[in-house]
């Protein structure tokens, strides 16, 4: 029942005690860095790497997020690249060399314009920090609606390309970053919150991105949950039978509807 209660976002009960299993802190990973001329090239490399290895990190940044971070850090990121990949390898010794060679081979096969291994901790951390700075960097450009859609890995390129097309169609900037190794993306819908027309278009973009994720066989939430903003898409995500079953479970465990009312149903 653990997954049922955790996934219910507080609508079935309140967690009062949690037992954690701790694992040793890993040593810093080697990080392979690559810039790509197209989204398709970058996501093709993600699929290739993930089919050969189990990297510790596979992070993606699109052109909007690259440029936002470069505006903030001036660290020399390639402003003309359509995508940046960071692939982490926590193997050591000979195994690390073999894995990194396979990662770089995938980069080359998929047309990376620049690639290298940040094998010292300081350089690796600078690129990981750049990825972590993507959200605050984009928040400097305007108000942000953060999405959390995911798809099966082979559809990742279709999703990211489609996200960009949706933004362009509505005249709204969308910067996408992703935990690309599992197909989980965070499109950031950037808009002027003082402009009612932009607010309306941003909401349309938000909804169409979720429609696209569902159409591609994915999910409206890879990490952040349904909450209140995504309720309207929940039945389309689950299908009518699974949605009805969820409502029956809710009714059985919370007949008075007092647990986190209005969330995720």
Where are each of the predicted segments found?
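Noncatalytic alpha-helical scaffold of FAD-dependent oxidoreductases
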Residues: 1-265
